[in-house]
Regions:
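Beta-lactam-recognizing serine transpeptidase/beta-lactamase-like catalytic domain environment
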Residues: 2-5, 83, 216-217, 221-225, ...
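Periplasmic/cell-envelope proteins involved in peptidoglycan metabolism and beta-lactam response
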Residues: 1-298, 324, 399-407, 519-521, ...
Length: 667
């Protein structure tokens, strides 16, 4: 073998000048970048330090809790609380905390059982299924007393084993008088609201506050609180004492006699303030969806959810503002006032009633087939003579009659501050033919609501001023300071004081010697008018009877309107139940309001009502014979006809309908 030669040595790479320069440049670049960052940080610290500090702190938020506002109260005119929000608590579970130590679970469950109506298995399930949760709302609207009892147990727990339970402050809406004025006050719950609660929701509603917590730069816990803005208080015109009187008498009537529905409205004619209002079923505002007071369990079991909702809507519906019927004879004073204003009649005008009037070839009878004979203007209202009213309507003609109907807000909303007010139906001027005018003159062929009739009569007896009916008396802050005072709103001057005086005196005679003697209250001068309406279908012989009265006659301070829908008697048409119920209510309301007593035997200006005329048979004229009425379009309310004076022979009364003749459409 040959010999190996000597091994070759590896050449060492030299760190050349070029590489040294590159390394130096890289180092300098890094230094420059680092210096630039330092300069930038210094700049930001001085120029935008506060802004960035706040941004960082905002990202370190510890907690954020809503602070519930308190909804404003609803009071009666004297400060009696009808609706308020009370302080309650929501029970919050913190499963993460409860599970953090084994010894926490059982003592905590035991304390919950002692103080609250809890389902232990349900709580265990929540803790197991949400082990990392720190916020589970378990119960709502817990009274403060129960919370205080639980907190006392926590305080007495020396081992500190009751953990993971805390309470969130909240408010609960309560109605101290339960069903009192339920149609007016209304309720707010589960996304539904009615009455004042609905109409003045914006004023009653406040704004939630919020509590924030975070750690500052030194890790100190900081709290920022934005206080809640509470809602305003609504002071209503309702008088709780008068409301109680009304509801007591209606309840007694329903127990003794009964009806499909009984409604009463009490208002001050001088400013149109509503003092009391009731209609339909009375329900507990604290539990408005409870149907058990109205239906048996078997009935409820058979009802679908849709049927239950329909039943609730019927119960919640306010008949006074949302339902309509033919006003009948309660409208007659409006026709008389219109003709007086136009100078077509006077208190000395006389009329002859032969028991029937031929209108465009059709015979329309008066209630008294034999006729009333010659009667004065006052006696047309005293004895509710349809023939005389048709004569007056004929003198008026269509245009003035329609103008006065609209002046008294028939066919329009009155503007009362309650939701779901209806307009009713009246004939348009171009549809007021001779027959339509004749029947409308005595209150038949068109629909109106209780609030429309009461507001119109108030204007007739207060000197002629039509005020907007209202329920708001005052708006207050949550501290009780007055924000707004609701003064009487004059809509228009409907008739003159002279006309008002004549009508008042005629209505006084109606109570003293006419069709409304059952409404008399000893010691008080009362004016008023009866009404009877026949409902559809006619063959069922179902009627709605009514009476509207005011006192004292010289200077009316209160109007009371009573409607009894289908009284539980055989002869509904000739019943005087509305007048009698008025009498019972007025007998208590007048003394309560300090209405001055005046002996009715004293001389009183009766607008020439004492003139010597052929006097009808009072017994016959105190009956009211209903006639055919109207067929409503799209109404939920039962439709009714009129009353005491239009028996017909082979004649169908014209009606104002939605499709062609109604001046307004129900909404």
């Amino acid at each position: 073998m040959g010999e190996r030669g000597p091994a070759k040595k590896k050449k060492k790479k030299k760190f050349g000048l070029f590489m040294q320069q590159n390394l130096l440049l890289s180092f300098l670049l890094i230094v420059l970048i680092f210096v630039g960052l330092i300069v930038r940080l210094i700049y930001l610290n001085y120029s935008d330090g506060d802004k960035y500090e706040k941004r960082v702190l905002s990202q370190q938020t510890y907690m954020s809790n809503a602070i519930a506002y308190k909804r404003g109260s609803i009071l009666d005119r004297n400060g009696i609380v009808l609706a308020e929000s009370i302080h309650v608590y929501n029970l919050i579970l913190d499963p993460l905390k409860i599970r953090s130590k084994e010894e926490y679970l059982e003592p905590t469950l035991k304390a919950l059982r002692e103080c609250f109506d809890v389902n232990e298995e349900e709580v265990r399930k929540i803790i197991e299924e949400k082990p990392k949760s720190q916020y589970v709302v378990y119960q709502k609207s817990i009274e403060a007393e129960k919370v205080e009892k639980f907190q006392a147990l926590v305080k007495a727990d020396k081992d500190k084993t009751i953990q993971g339970v805390w309470f969130e402050a909240d408010y609960k809406r309560v109605y101290p008088y339960k069903s009192l004025a339920c149609d007016v006050v209304g309720f707010t719950s589960a996304g539904t609201s009615t009455g004042i609660e609905a109409y003045y929701n914006e004023q009653l509603t406040g704004e939630d506050g919020r509590e924030y917590g975070y750690f500052d730069s030194e890790l100190n816990l900081e709290r920022v609180v934005k206080e809640a803005a509470n809602g305003n208080t609504v002071v209503s015109t309702i008088d709780a004492n008068i409301q109680q009187i009304v509801e007591k008498q209606v309840a007694k009537f329903n127990k003794d006699i009964g009806s499909k529905n009984t409604a009463v409205l009490v208002m001050n004619p001088k400013n149109a303030e509503i003092l009391a209002m009731t209609s339909g079923e009375q329900y507990d505002l604290n539990n408005p969806q409870d149907l058990t007071p109205f239906y048996k369990k078997k009935q409820l079991d058979r009802m679908s959810e849709e049927e239950k909702l329909e039943a609730l809507n019927r119960i919640w519906r306010n008949f006074v503002v949302s339902d309509t019927f033919e006003p009948g004879s309660t409208f007659k004073p409006v026709t008389v006032a219109a003709a007086l204003e136009e100078g077509l009649i006077s208190p000395k005008t006389t009329f002859y009633c032969g028991g029937v009037k031929n209108v465009s070839g059709s015979h329309i009878h008066c209630a008294k087939r034999a006729g009333h004979g010659t009667i004065t203007l006052a006696q047309t209202l005293m004895f509710s003579c349809n023939v005389a009213l048709m004569d007056i309507g004929e003198k008026l003609k269509a245009h003035p009659f329609y103008r006065y109907q609209t002046n008294f807000m028939f066919g329009s909303r009155t503007g009362i501050d309650l939701p779901a007010e209806t307009t009713g139906y009246i004939f348009k001027e171009e549809n007021l033919g001779s027959t339509e005018l004749a029947t409308s003159s005595f209150g038949q062929g068109f629909n109106s609501s209780m609030i429309q009739i009461a507001s119109a009569v108030s204007a007739l007896v207060n000197g002629g001023s039509y005020y907007q009916p209202h329920l708001l008396k005052e708006l207050q802050s949550d501290k009780g300071a007055t924000i707004e005072t609701n003064t009487a709103k004059l809509i228009k001057k409907a008739v003159s004081p002279e006309t008002s005086a004549i009508v008042k005196n005629a209505l006084f005679e109606t109570v003293e010697n006419g069709t409304a003697t059952a409404a008399k209250v000893e010691g008080y001068q009362i004016g008023g008018k009866t009404g009877t309406a026949q409902k559809l279908p006619r063959k069922d012989k179902k009627y709605l009877v009514s009476f509207i009265g005011f006192a004292p006659v010289e200077d009316p301070e209160v109007v009371i309107y009573v409607v009894v829908d289908e009284p539980d008697v055989a002869d509904q048409a000739h019943s005087t139940f509305a007048s009698e119920l008025f009498q019972k209510i007025a007998s208590e309301v007048y003394p309560f309001l300090n209405i001055p007593r005046t002996a009715v035997e004293e001389e009183h200006d009766k607008g020439n009502a004492k003139e010597e005329v052929s006097k009808p048979d009072e017994k016959d004229d105190q009956k009211e014979t209903p006639a055919d009425g109207i067929t409503p379009a799209g109404q939920v309310a039962p439709s009714v006809g009129d009353e005491e004076g239009s028996e017909q022979e082979d004649f169908d009364l014209p009606v104002a309908d939605q499709s062609s003749s109604a001046s307004n459409i129900y909404e």
